[in-house]
Amino acid sequence: MLLLLLKWYLKYYISTYMDNRPSKGNFLEILLRSSKTVFSVQDVALLWGESESTTITNRLKKYIRAGKLLRVRHGLYAKDENYDRYELATRIYTPSYIGFETVLTREGVSFQYYGNIFVASYLNREIEANGQKITYVRMKRSVLSDTTGINHVNGVAWATKERAFLDRLYVTKEYHFDNLNVLDWDKVFEILTVYENKRLEKQVKKYHRNFVNTQ
């Protein structure tokens, strides 16, 4: 009886788990079908159902040599040259989100152009990844982990313009913003509580007061 139960369990396990693993020709196809444009080894392990890291990296190296995948950073791979550079920027150091001048410029709060991608993370660092300069700005852990004012678009975390405004003032005491008309001040004061910082509260009230007086 015990032997029969064991045989049944093995049959069930193989049909349920092993049969669902990709066949040899489908490994690359699974990556190409994914909504991600940038993959870590951990991402690939989950997509392939493979726990052996050596097997994964060897297979990835084979695809890179064949020109079917692109290595964009140590431990990070892309489908091709058209990968999302913002996705890459938030995958190198995590947790992180796109913010500061990248958002402020896109949203019309600041008019100066920056070629760098600015990212809020847990460290200060400037790097170049596959020709793209990325500036990481250190934020306090409690602030970084609070998702108030953070939106996720196509798998990439983005600060809202109000969050980017506050983040910049949080790390830079004095800063010139070209256009505060586009900010929702109710949202600014809502997000402000995340920082628990008296100096920042005073600074934001000053910017708001000056803004109101010029209207």
Regions inferred by a protein language model and the residue ranges of each:
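Short beta-edge/loop segments at beta->alpha junctions of small alpha/beta modules
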Residues: 10-95
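Nucleic-acid-binding surface
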Residues: 12, 78-215
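Intrinsically disordered, low-complexity and often Lys/Arg-enriched segments
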Residues: 1-18, 213-215
